[in-house]
């Protein structure tokens, strides 16, 4: 939520922008609430939005995109903190291999995955920087 929060920060008044913030538990539910008129807006990542266009077109048709945030790395693949380095390296290699395997092209297309690269924590610095900027602008918490 750091990129949307940073985009909203200049518009917030005394640290507030929304009358209420609702946590729905999923992007699909957030979009459904916007479509139903029980929420004014929601932040939906572009991959999830594309999947919802494909699988819930009637819901998406009752919404429209207001704005896009700045660019940031896509959502990461994650594993448990306790996963040892050797296993994590094997998992990373398998993901990158699957992302390039021609036999899996149809599956990747179904998930809107163009590929995968090994990311480092520094690759996500833009997300942390957006959080810092939002805090500096007085919008430290989404509200």
Give short role names for the model-derived ranges:
Residues 10, 35-36, 40-60:
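A ligand-binding cleft/hinge motif common to bilobed small-molecule-binding domains
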């Amino acid at each position: 939520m750091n990129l949307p929060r940073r985009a909203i920060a200049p518009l917030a008044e005394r640290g507030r922008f929304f009358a209420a913030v609702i946590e729905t538990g999923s992007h699909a539910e957030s979009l459904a609430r916007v479509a139903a008129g029980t929420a004014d807006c929601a932040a939906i990542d572009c991959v999830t939005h594309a999947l919802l266009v494909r699988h819930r077109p009637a819901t998406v048709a009752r919404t429209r995109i207001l704005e896009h945030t700045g660019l940031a790395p896509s959502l990461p693949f994650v594993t448990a903190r306790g996963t040892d380095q050797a296993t994590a390296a094997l998992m990373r290699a398998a993901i990158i291999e699957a992302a390039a395997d021609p036999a899996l092209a149809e599956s990747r297309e179904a998930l809107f995955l163009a590929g995968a690269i090994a990311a480092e924590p520094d690759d996500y610095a833009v997300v942390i920087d957006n959080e810092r900027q939002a805090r500096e602008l007085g919008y430290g918490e989404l509200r």
